[in-house]
Amino acid sequence: MASIWRYLLAGLGLTALLAGILAVVYLMAPQWGQPTGPDVSRSKASENGLFVASFQPEAGAVRQGELETWLLTLKTKAGAPVEGAAIAISGGMPQHDHGLPTSPQATDYLGDGQYRIEGVKFTMSGWWQLHFAISATAGSDTVVFNVVL
């Protein structure tokens, strides 16, 4: 009779242990599956790897609600500056399903693969995307930069 109680208590203990483990796994599972947010790196390879692009505000800081000038630097994957590129710019807020409030343009080639982008404006806080369609001697490619305010 004592051995039956021993097995019963051992079984209950094992059941409690497994229930505790399952509770921890259940509570932690949502955290494991959560996205960490958009990639906000300022330098990256283009979609097909033809170019390495970097993007930064000319004034050094992102300002909400102000018309800004940014610098886009384009290099080949071998590191040579990309000269004479045609650049089309679009974008918007993916979570709000609207485009940019302005029409940014590549206005000047500054040398060493650097292009001035004028007319960038972020009217509200949140996640913004800027899409660059690049056409140059090396070919055509795209790159997308995320900006979170």
Language-model features: locations:
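Contiguous segments within soluble domain cores/interaction surfaces
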Residues: 5-15, 20-129, 133-149
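N-terminal secretory signal peptides that target proteins for export/translocation
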Residues: 1-3
